[in-house]
Amino acid sequence: MDGTDMTEQPVYKRVLLKVSGEALMGSREYGLDKAMVQTIASDIADVVAFGVEVCLVIGGGNIFRGVSAAASGMDRAQGDYIGMLATVMNALAMQAALEKLNVPTRVQSAIPMASVCEPYVRRRAQRHMEKGRVVIFAAGTGNPFFTTDTAAALRAAEMGCNVLLKGTQVDGVYAADPRKNPDAERYNELTYLDVLSRDLSVMDAAAISLCRENHLPIIVFNIHETGAFGRVIRGEGRFTRIVETQ
């Protein structure tokens, strides 16, 4: 843990943190950066220690992307299933990092693999969280053609989370990729319709629509910034908030 100041009351009681697979790469071009995984785990541990119930959805883009494979000629459904298995690998790596910090963690997969992790069972996941355990949801929704962002929106709604936090490699939502266009406009707050009408690259339309229908706010922040997760939980730091109305 990094000693983040968590003396102020958290704004949220139960949250879902979506971590992209790419965020786990750190400065690498492929796979997992162990130091980055441990840093993110440390931030999660600080938030859990403050009494916040946390669940996660982790992407698999650092290992395999079904959409990219489909563009290269692979059957899309087959590619998506491979991508789902990649998320299980990432989930197990994050579980190991959290348990190294003595944070009790369970992995639940939408694709049953009993010898590796628990199957996804909604009520069991809720009980885990009530007992202070972190739950990592793996294998997306278990269905091809759905992104892990949509899986995050679905699980957040099922778990009754107060907010969906998307940890990315930049500190919010921009009109264009700020790493390619330093002058890109940054937004502090947007509505769901803003994101959809402007075709902003935050989440896919299905994920945004699911959050909108369930009145689930979305917060986008830089997960590579040490302690950022804890600051967002307290309503501090730099982030973009996506809500029904501004």
UniProtKB/Swiss-Prot annotation:
Q: Does the keyword ATP-binding apply?
A: yes
Gene Ontology MF term list? ATP binding; UMP kinase activity
Residues annotated to bind ATP: 18-21, 61, 65, 168-169, 174, 177
Output the superkingdom of the source species.
Answer: Bacteria
Residue positions binding UMP: 60, 80, 141-148
- Record's catalysed reaction(s): UMP + ATP = UDP + ADP
Query: For this protein, what is the EC number?
Result: 2.7.4.22
The pathway that the record names for this protein is: Pyrimidine metabolism; CTP biosynthesis via de novo pathway; UDP from UMP (UMPK route): step 1/1
InterPro entries found in the cross-reference section: AceGlu_kinase-like_sf, Asp/Glu/Uridylate_kinase, Uridylate_kinase, Uridylate_kinase_bac
Record Pfam families: AA_kinase
Look up keyword ATP-binding and say if it applies.
yes
Entry GO terms, CC:
cytoplasm
Question: Which keywords does UniProt give here?
Answer: ATP-binding, Cytoplasm, Kinase, Nucleotide-binding, Pyrimidine biosynthesis, Transferase
Where is this protein localized, as stated in its record?
Cytoplasm
Regulation of this protein's activity per its record: Inhibited by UTP.
One GO biological process term:
UDP biosynthetic process
| Subunit annotation | Homohexamer.
Quote the function comment for this protein: Catalyzes the reversible phosphorylation of UMP to UDP.
Family membership noted in the UniProt record = Belongs to the UMP kinase family.
Q: What is this protein called?
A: Uridylate kinase
> Organism, per UniProt?
Granulibacter bethesdensis (strain ATCC BAA-1260 / CGDNIH1)
Q: Which gene encodes it?
A: pyrH
